[in-house]
């Protein structure tokens, strides 16, 4: 039996490209501020998952401040991240995401 993955992580650029990550399959920018992330392991059913998402640079670039929200989707391998500027307006932002499973 494969070992249960307890953590997932990624850094996503504003265009939806994956800068780096662990156990991430893909990321798609689906609207001005909405990203759909597909993981290699399910976030639901076999596991309970908690998330931490912060706006942050991909490497060394300056980043405009903002906030991100996370949510599960019907597909247990997928989740949604939405990013906003500090006024609450949808905005593309790079972000760091960590998921903790138990």
Q: What are the functions of these language-model segments?
A:
Residues 1-102:
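Extracellular attachment/recognition segments
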């Amino acid at each position: 039996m494969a070992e249960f993955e307890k953590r997932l992580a990624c850094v996503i650029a504003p265009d939806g490209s994956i800068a780096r990550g662990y156990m991430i399959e893909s990321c798609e920018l689906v609207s001005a501020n909405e990203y759909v992330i597909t993981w290699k392991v399910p976030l639901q059913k076999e596991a309970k998952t908690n998330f931490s998402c912060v706006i942050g640079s991909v490497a060394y670039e300056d980043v405009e401040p903002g906030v991100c929200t996370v949510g599960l989707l019907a597909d247990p391998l997928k989740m949604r991240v939405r990013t906003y500027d500090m006024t609450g307006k949808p905005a593309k932002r790079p972000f760091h995401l960590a998921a903790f499973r138990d």
